[in-house]
């Protein structure tokens, strides 16, 4: 896949345009009795969404937890004080662009609470934001309890990271999480942490906001394919996908060797799920549930077949809005104190009430808020719908600074061969010497050593590994951070080395030279000669990616970019 067309990973521009849709709040239709899927004596009604809200909030909290865990583990080395692209330097550049001001213009360009914090220790700020996010998301995940305050905090914290993360946070799933999280704010009651807040039933507007989101995600992904690479029309894209996806897993190794007819079936199934199934949302309860089941199964298959970060896990979240309490009852235990019993009591009270329940001021305010949300989402959806209908459709783009409603798409084109950048170092005084021994650095997950088994890490992901995949399609001049990484490896920088799996110079003097080599990779044939030798990959050198460099060669390069020159260990002399 080309990096500029990969939907879930395509980097967005520095100036982001941002956008979603909505629906009007309306009272639930007269509920009908349905046999509880858990086969308990209680009969849960259709048409209510108390349990749906709990499942949605827990699922969203899980994604937030993974996202903040990735941030806590990787941000310091990527955007910290001495990171590959320091966020302090980025914010200073934004400030200078707006004549040294941190006013409204700077806030709307890069909405982040970093503007309010002390920049003298950005590593502390980054860890603080990540730990707060981990703490709040853990609470919601474990308890199923949330209110608007907690969900707003999660959304604001993650948005603060995304808007200073630069290219490391330019993947499509960042905007998708922010849009999903924004809807999650209005899914919750304002103050109470009750899992079943009787005065705050789940809003139909918010539910339709989630349904509108999954509709756009899937239809956008389907349309970008049929408008993009012709292999989606001649049904051959899956012949290449498993081998050339950003970070393959072991299952992809075997799926790649599936019969040709199976790959054709996969492609046709993809078109069915992405182009036709989304319209099931508008065909009543049964078809909506069928839509939810098909979309979740589709995402599970994608999760099994590749390390696509938490993208597919995240896409499951809005699909949950297709199910009501009767459909999700099987997820909850039965019992006199169980949630199903409590929901049944609420349903009975509603059905037995002769007069409509009087609404207090809080309920009326909440209804106004929900209607306002629907109007906002509908308004922001206008350019998104225009984009969907356009023959020049773009994906993973936002039309507003808060990324409330966005465009989506995936794999608009598929690359037909896999290339990788391999970083190598040597302690030889002369990089051109025939006897110079070059040793490979190994990344956490991206292909490198042909004998190393592909990793299995979804929903976790390594941002550096993903960017290395993009770098292989471009030049090092287009990816200045890769030379920053090379400089840090030359100095034996511990933060940079923590981003890698294997440092060939561990316990030794750092290398004198670093170079980048460009290789073509192919899966070995299961049962073939290379596979029997233990190789998962066959690789062939294409040529140099960047020439051999010493730390002193990078001094001017670092100076012009205001990067501090890494200091080699005192025991190391050159």
Curated annotation (Swiss-Prot):
Lumenal topology ranges? 73-127, 222-292, 389-574
GO cellular component terms, A-Z = endoplasmic reticulum membrane
Species annotation: Mus musculus
**What's this protein's name?**
Lipase maturation factor 1
Keywords, comma-separated and alphabetical: Chaperone, Endoplasmic reticulum, Membrane, Transmembrane, Transmembrane helix
Query: What interactions and quaternary structure are annotated?
Result: Interacts with LPL and SEL1L.
**Principal place where this protein is found?**
endoplasmic reticulum
Q: How does it sit in the membrane?
A: Multi-pass membrane protein
- Say what the protein does: Involved in the maturation of specific proteins in the endoplasmic reticulum. Required for maturation and transport of active lipoprotein lipase (LPL) through the secretory pathway. Each LMF1 molecule chaperones 50 or more molecules of LPL.
User: In which tissues or organs does this protein occur?
Assistant: Expressed in all tissues synthesizing lipoprotein lipase (Lpl) and hepatic lipase (Lipc), including adipose tissue, skeletal muscle, heart, and liver. Expressed at higher levels in tissues that express little or no lipase activity such as testis and pancreas suggesting additional functions in these tissues.
């Amino acid at each position: 896949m080309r990096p500029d067309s990969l939907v879930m990973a395509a980097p967005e521009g520095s100036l982001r345009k941002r956008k979603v849709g909505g629906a009007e709040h309306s009272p639930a239709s007269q509920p009908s009795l349905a046999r509880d899927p858990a086969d308990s004596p209680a009969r849960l009604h259709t048409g209510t969404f108390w349990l749906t809200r709990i499942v949605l909030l827990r699922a969203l909290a899980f994604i937030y937890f993974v996202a903040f865990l990735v941030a806590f583990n990787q941000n310091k080395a990527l955007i910290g004080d001495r990171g590959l692209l320091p966020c302090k330097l980025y914010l200073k550049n934004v400030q200078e662009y707006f004549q040294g001001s941190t006013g409204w213009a700077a806030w709307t360009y890069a909405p982040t609470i970093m503007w309010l914090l002390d920049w003298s220790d950005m590593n502390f700020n980054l860890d603080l934001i990540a730990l707060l996010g981990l703490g709040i998301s853990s609470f919601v995940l474990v308890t199923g309890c949330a209110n608007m305050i907690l969900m707003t905090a999660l959304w604001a914290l993650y948005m603060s990271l995304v808007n200073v993360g630069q290219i490391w946070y330019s993947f499509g799933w960042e905007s998708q999480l922010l849009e999903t999280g924004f809807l999650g704010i209005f899914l919750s009651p304002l103050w109470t942490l009750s899992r079943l807040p009787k005065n705050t039933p789940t809003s139909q507007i918010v539910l339709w906001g989630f349904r509108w989101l999954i509709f756009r995600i899937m239809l956008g992904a389907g349309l970008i394919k049929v408008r993009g690479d012709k292999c989606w029309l001649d049904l051959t894209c899956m012949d290449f996908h498993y081998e050339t996806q950003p970070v393959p897993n072991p299952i992809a190794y075997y799926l790649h060797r599936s019969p040709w007819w199976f790959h054709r079936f996969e492609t046709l199934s993809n078109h069915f799920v992405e182009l036709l199934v989304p319209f099931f949302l508008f065909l009543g309860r049964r078809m909506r549930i069928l839509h939810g089941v098909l979309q979740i199964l589709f995402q599970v298959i994608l999760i099994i077949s590749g390390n696509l970060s938490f993208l597919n896990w995240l896409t499951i979240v809005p699909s949950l809005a297709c199910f009501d309490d009767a459909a999700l009852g099987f997820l909850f235990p039965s019992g006199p104190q169980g949630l199903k019993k409590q929901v049944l009591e609420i349903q009975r009270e509603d059905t037995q009430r002769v007069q409509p329940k009087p609404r207090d001021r809080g309920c009326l305010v909440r209804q106004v808020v929900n209607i306002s949300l629907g109007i906002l989402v509908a308004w922001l959806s206008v350019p998104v719908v225009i984009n969907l209908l356009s023959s020049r459709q773009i994906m993973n783009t936002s039309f507003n600074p808060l990324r409330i409603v966005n465009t989506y798409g995936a794999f608009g084109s598929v690359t037909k061969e896999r290339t990788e950048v391999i970083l190598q170092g040597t302690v030889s005084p002369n990089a051109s010497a025939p006897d110079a021994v070059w040793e490979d650095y190994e990344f956490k997950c991206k292909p490198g050593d042909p004998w190393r088994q592909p990793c299995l890490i979804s929903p976790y992901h390594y941002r550096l590994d993903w960017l290395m995949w993009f770098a292989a399609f471009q030049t090092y001049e287009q990816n200045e951070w890769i030379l920053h990484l090379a400089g840090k490896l030359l100095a034996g920088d511990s933060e940079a080395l923590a981003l890698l799996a294997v440092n060939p110079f561990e316990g030794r003097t750092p290398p004198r030279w670093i170079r980048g080599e460009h290789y073509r990779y192919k899966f070995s044939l299961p049962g073939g000669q290379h596979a029997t030798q233990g190789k998962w990959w066959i690789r062939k050198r294409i040529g140099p990616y960047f020439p051999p460099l010493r730390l002193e060669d990078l001094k001017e390069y670092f100076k012009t970019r205001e990067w501090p020159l890494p200091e080699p260990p005192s025991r190391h002399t050159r």
